[in-house]
Amino acid sequence: MNIILLGPPGAGKGTQSQRLVERHGMRQLSTGDMLRAAVKAQTPVGLKAKAVMDRGELVSDDIVSELIDAELTAMHGNVGAIFDGYPRTAAQAGQLDVILAKHDRSLDKVIELEVNEEALVDRITGRFTCAKCGTGYHDRHKQPAREGVCDVCGSTEFKRRPDDNEETVRTRMQEYRAKTAPILPIYEERGLVERVDGMGGIDEVTAAIDALLK
């Protein structure tokens, strides 16, 4: 099973990708993570990418495709792939088809986690964590049992991510729509796109995705 998992920041894509890895033995292929790892390991494609980035240029589709190709080559044929952050353009979608065919694979599903923008703004802007143990809380949905005291470790220090503000969240939503707009119609024409309500509980979303993969 090879899938593309789509969803804006805050939709729970990272959490669900990890669930797929744990429950189905799949491999998450995040182009950003792979690029950083290749540069750090000084692989041939990593050195090529570093030279481009050192010039202040964007890494080309060809280099990203090389990364994907190398990862699939290293993977066992029975291990499914979760593509995260790729493809983002029609050209990349075409390249992915070629790469998958080379490895006797095909794309089975494109799953989009749908979110309500207003609810997503509320979810993200209200979240905060214990500065000591990292336990997550929310202004409206999950306050500590004792005000100002972490339920887990008893710390009284909390923190918020500086980019968890309404303006940034809405900008991210716009960027996400712009990035996915070119590729969704391609996969919709093939009948591969499935949509899951990303605003449900984590277990509910996981169950909905599992049902699509059966």
From Swiss-Prot:
Top-level taxon of origin: Bacteria
Gene that specifies this protein: adk
Domain notes: Consists of three domains, a large central CORE domain and two small peripheral domains, NMPbind and LID, which undergo movements during catalysis. The LID domain closes over the site of phosphoryl transfer upon ATP binding. Assembling and dissambling the active center during each catalytic cycle provides an effective means to prevent ATP hydrolysis. Some bacteria have evolved a zinc-coordinating structure that stabilizes the LID domain.
Chain intervals for the UniProt region annotation (LID): 126-163
GO BP annotations listed: AMP salvage
E.C. designation(s): 2.7.4.3
Assigned protein family: Belongs to the adenylate kinase family.
Subunit structure: Monomer.
Record localization: Cytoplasm
Region (NMP): 30-59
Biological pathway: Purine metabolism; AMP biosynthesis via salvage pathway; AMP from ADP: step 1/1
Binding-site positions, ATP: 10-15, 127, 200
Physiological role: Catalyzes the reversible transfer of the terminal phosphate group between ATP and AMP. Plays an important role in cellular energy homeostasis and in adenine nucleotide metabolism.
The protein, known as: Adenylate kinase
